[in-house]
């Protein structure tokens, strides 16, 4: 009887560990159903932040925002965890200069489906603005230093 309970408990532990309950995310990262997110308060250029995200988690990249729901999730995550007075937070959107026009892409290689951008300047990188509660994307100089959000598959 004790052996059956022990085996049953062991199978339950294995099942729960394989069920994708958020345990698939790196320690201290936040998750939705499919992705893991982390707000880093290191001040990096866009390129440095993009490289850093690839080193933090398997399949990691600067955050791509694919829906209004994900935009709200990311904005809330930043607002709850903000530890700096920076005006912007880097996201993974950037303009690829391909003659004769620009093509906006995410660092994970995906195309832009959902868009909430205000292009005030002729710049190639994008960030979320503090004044809009991190809900609107602005194009910025890629060489500026800001905190950033990384995203990886769960």
Curated annotation (Swiss-Prot):
Record key words, sorted: Disulfide bond, Glycoprotein, Secreted, Signal
Location of the protein in the cell: Secreted
Glycosylation sites: 139
One GO CC term, this protein: extracellular region
SUPFAM superfamilies in UniProt: C-type lectin-like
Domain of life: Eukaryota
Coiled-coil residue spans: none
SMART domains documented for this protein: CLECT
InterPro entries in alphabetical order: C-type_lectin-like, C-type_lectin-like/link_sf, C-type_lectin/snaclec_domain, C-type_lectin_CS, CTDL_fold
Gene3D superfamilies: Mannose-Binding Protein A, subunit A
Signal peptide start and end residues: 1-23
SS bond list: 25-36, 53-150, 125-142
Domain C-type lectin: 32-151
A Pfam family it matches: Lectin_C
Distribution of this protein across tissues and organs: Expressed by the venom gland.
Family to which the UniProt record says this protein belongs: Belongs to the snaclec family.
Main function: Inhibits human breast cancer cells (MDA-MB231) migration and proliferation, as well as their adhesion to fibrinogen and fibronectin. This inhibition may be due to the binding to receptors of the integrin family, probably alpha-v/beta-3 (ITGAV/ITGB3) (40% inhibition of cell adhesion) and alpha-5/beta-1 (ITGA5/ITGB1) (by comparison with lebectin).
Self-association state and partner proteins as the record states: Heterodimer with the alpha subunit (AC W5XDM0); disulfide-linked.
Name of protein: Snaclec lebecin subunit beta
Organism of provenance: Macrovipera lebetinus
Lineage: Eukaryota, Metazoa, Chordata, Craniata, Vertebrata
């Amino acid at each position: 009887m004790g052996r059956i309970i022990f085996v049953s408990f062991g199978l339950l532990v294995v099942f729960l560990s394989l069920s994708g309950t958020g345990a698939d995310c790196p320690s201290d990262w936040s998750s939705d159903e499919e992705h893991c997110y982390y707000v880093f308060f290191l001040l990096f250029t866009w390129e440095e932040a993009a490289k850093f995200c690839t080193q933090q988690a398997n399949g990691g990249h600067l955050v791509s925002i694919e829906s209004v729901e994900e935009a709200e999730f990311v904005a809330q995550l930043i607002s709850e965890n903000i530890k700096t007075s920076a005006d912007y937070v880097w996201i993974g959107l950037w303009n690829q200069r391909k003659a004769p026009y620009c093509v906006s892409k995410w660092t994970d290689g995906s195309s832009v489906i959902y868009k909430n951008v205000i292009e005030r300047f002729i710049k190639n990188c994008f960030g979320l603005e503090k004044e809009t509660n991190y809900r609107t994307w602005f194009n910025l100089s890629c060489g500026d230093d800001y905190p950033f959000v990384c995203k990886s598959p769960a």
